[in-house]
């Protein structure tokens, strides 16, 4: 999760987020080099006496400042398209989880398990335990297996919402009457926090998302326990 005064992105816990952070650093380095070059040229213009003010024809420099930006754009576009196609790959997901946005809470349905569904509300401040985070904790955490491809089906029952977990590199709009799809996976166990990222009304700030990734065998035990309890 984010920390106070953090300037960079959150630590990645999924392969997609690792690719996004690498692309972010790649694009930032290109921007830094361009900015340095422009600043250098501006400083030269302000400090150097111009001796060729009457030059009207410079084919070489015109070719350079036409071709060079095109090459830079290609260097940015190719990795961007690669990541875009990676986020749309769905190869035999282990589990399907449906997230439904409401004003102002989330509902979750495990499509592969019969009658396994629950609502997830924000935990009020006066119910927080020591070490829990204000405005980020929920009463029912979403438990998922780690190191598994999980297909998310995201929709809404009322207004526009957005299901976002930054450390997993997932941000998908929840639209009434439409079912959007996303893929997520975590390479390590732990708690990962997110929030609704679409202004959806007066309590938009009170729609946190908490994902708890655990080991396969522990997840099966958890799912079996919930199924027995629901009988």
From Swiss-Prot:
The chain crosses the membrane at residues 15-45, 60-87. Residues 1-14, 88-231 are mitochondrial intermembrane. It is found in: Mitochondrion inner membrane. Cu cation A1 binds at residues 161, 196, 200, 207. The keyword Transit peptide does not apply. CDD domains: CcO_II_C. Cu cation A2 binds at residues 196, 198, 200, 204. Its cofactor is Cu cation. GO terms for molecular function: copper ion binding; cytochrome-c oxidase activity. Mg(2+) binds at residue 198. It catalyses: 4 Fe(II)-[cytochrome c] + O2 + 8 H(+)(in) = 4 Fe(III)-[cytochrome c] + 2 H2O + 4 H(+)(out). Component of the cytochrome c oxidase (complex IV, CIV), a multisubunit enzyme composed of 14 subunits. The complex is composed of a catalytic core of 3 subunits MT-CO1, MT-CO2 and MT-CO3, encoded in the mitochondrial DNA, and 11 supernumerary subunits COX4I, COX5A, COX5B, COX6A, COX6B, COX6C, COX7A, COX7B, COX7C, COX8 and NDUFA4, which are encoded in the nuclear genome. Belongs to the cytochrome c oxidase subunit 2 family. This is Cytochrome c oxidase subunit 2. The lineage of its organism: Eukaryota, Metazoa, Chordata, Craniata, Vertebrata. The gene is MT-CO2.
């Amino acid at each position: 999760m984010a920390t106070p005064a953090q300037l960079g992105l959150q630590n990645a816990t999924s392969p997609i987020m690792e690719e996004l952070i690498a692309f972010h650093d790649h694009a930032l380095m290109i921007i830094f080099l361009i900015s340095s070059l422009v600043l250098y040229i501006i400083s030269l213009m302000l400090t150097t006496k111009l001796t060729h003010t009457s030059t009207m024809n410079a084919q070489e420099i015109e070719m350079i400042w036409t071709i060079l930006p095109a090459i830079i754009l290609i260097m940015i576009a190719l990795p961007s398209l690669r990541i875009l196609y990676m986020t749309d790959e769905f190869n035999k997901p282990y589990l399907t989880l449906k997230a439904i946005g409401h004003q102002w809470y989330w509902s979750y349905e495990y499509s592969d398990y019969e009658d396994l569904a629950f609502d997830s509300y924000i935990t009020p401040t006066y119910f927080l335990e020591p070490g829990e985070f204000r405005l980020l904790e929920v009463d029912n955490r979403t438990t998922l297996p780690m190191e598994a491809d999980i297909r998310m089906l995201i929709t809404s029952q009322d207004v526009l919402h957005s299901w976002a977990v930054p450390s997993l590199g997932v941000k998908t709009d929840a639209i009434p009457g439409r079912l959007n799809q996303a893929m997520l996976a975590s390479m390590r166990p732990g708690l990962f926090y997110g929030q609704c990222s679409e202004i959806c009304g007066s309590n938009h700030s009170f729609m946190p998302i908490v994902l708890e990734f655990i080991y396969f065998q522990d997840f099966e035990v958890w799912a079996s326990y919930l199924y027995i309890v629901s009988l």
